[in-house]
Amino acid sequence: MSAIKFNPSSFRKNFKWFENNKNWINFDNAATSIALDVVAEASKEYYQYFCVNPHNKNPEINQKLIAIIEETRDLLAKFFNAKKNEIIFTSSATESLNLFAFGLSSLVKSNDEIILKEDEHAANVFPWVNLAKENKAKLKIIKKTPNKSWTDAFLKACTPSTKLLVITATSNLFGNSIDYEKISKHLKKISPNSFIVVDAVQAVPHHKIDITSANIDFLTFSTHKFYGPTGLGIAFIKSELQSRLKPFKLGGDIFKSLDNNFKIIFKEGPSKFEAGTLNIMAIYALNKQLKFMQKEFNFSEMVFYSKQLKNLAYQLLSQNPNIVLANHDQDVPIFAFKHKYINSADLATFLNIKKIIVRQGSICVGKFKNKESFLRVSLLHYNTKEELLYLEKLLKTSKNSIINELIY
């Protein structure tokens, strides 16, 4: 790995997790990243100094908290090159995707096409399957042909009847990415009234995303995948579409008025989609996290380091005689593979004994449920060359040695 400005050793010093879990290696970062210390500290700070409800807008403490919430919205908008009023707080990316599907239910008609690919995460399948069934829309599940990319498959699948295109920017299982900007430009030309949804959960830690340039309508990610707090999702909805969508949840502070005939007049902007009390503690912690990362680290350098990790991991795994990679078009350091002689469940147990955290199974991808079991290694910026070399050494362990380790 060539010398770069980003220093993973320095970055690791911002995570007490490594002190508290000495000798452990976390290679399951696509499931949840380790949270920065500033996130834990901010969580404690919120409960000790704030812990009030922002729906009460008069007290001074509440006003400070409201300002922090709106500042966080602004920080996210700048990070993604979006408008502040296009950033909506949810509980997770899963909720965001359900929010999108429910909101679009009045805009997707019978025989409209909904396109998604066959190996999507379940959270990005079920809402659209349900929408297609309820609205009698045509659900088009696309497959990738040999020697062609997913981008090519999406471009080929688009027609003037396509109403909704659902894209996972980066696969949680295979680590390959899709050129959603290219697809968006193509689709909007042949079907101007179509909508594009992007699941960016795995892309956000590894790619710079420009929502405005990409001309997408909906996007989501979860903060716990990028060193942030759990229980918080970020949903982007293009401002000009918000008035056309039904809110997924109904409750306090989302409406302007309710007349005698129970007709609801909703508020404009994010408030329409943020019923009830938000996860204020998580938003507060995210605010501190974003400011800390902007001050201390250059995201472009982090993206470059991510590429270096991916290249090294691919080199080590692809050259290992015991390992069969599921694919060879990874764009980020997420790898699914099988061992030639040891099943994935046993291999995961063996690595756990050696204090390496990995993921085993179909990894929430419905296509492989009860069919194939992979072992997944997913890396983030605190992972190191030394950790990968240790993994390589273990994966070269003989079959008999692994079996003996499991038995005894």
UniProtKB/Swiss-Prot annotation:
Protein EC: 2.8.1.7
Molecular function GO terms recorded: cysteine desulfurase activity
Annotated catalysed reactions: (sulfur carrier)-H + L-cysteine = (sulfur carrier)-SH + L-alanine
InterPro entries: Aminotrans_V_dom (IPR000192), Aminotrans_V_PyrdxlP_BS (IPR020578), PyrdxlP-dep_Trfase (IPR015424), PyrdxlP-dep_Trfase_major (IPR015421), PyrdxlP-dep_Trfase_small (IPR015422)
A Pfam match: Aminotran_5
Cofactor(s) listed: pyridoxal 5'-phosphate
Residues with the N6-(pyridoxal phosphate)lysine modification: K225
UniProtKB keywords: Pyridoxal phosphate, Transferase
Top enzyme class: transferase
PROSITE patterns hit by this protein: AA_TRANSFER_CLASS_5 (PS00595)
Role description: Catalyzes the removal of elemental sulfur and selenium atoms from L-cysteine, L-cystine, L-selenocysteine, and L-selenocystine to produce L-alanine.
Family label: Belongs to the class-V pyridoxal-phosphate-dependent aminotransferase family. Csd subfamily.
The protein's name in its UniProt record: Probable cysteine desulfurase
Source species of the chain: Mycoplasma genitalium (strain ATCC 33530 / DSM 19775 / NCTC 10195 / G37) (Mycoplasmoides genitalium)
Lineage of origin: Bacteria, Bacillati, Mycoplasmatota, Mycoplasmoidales, Mycoplasmoidaceae
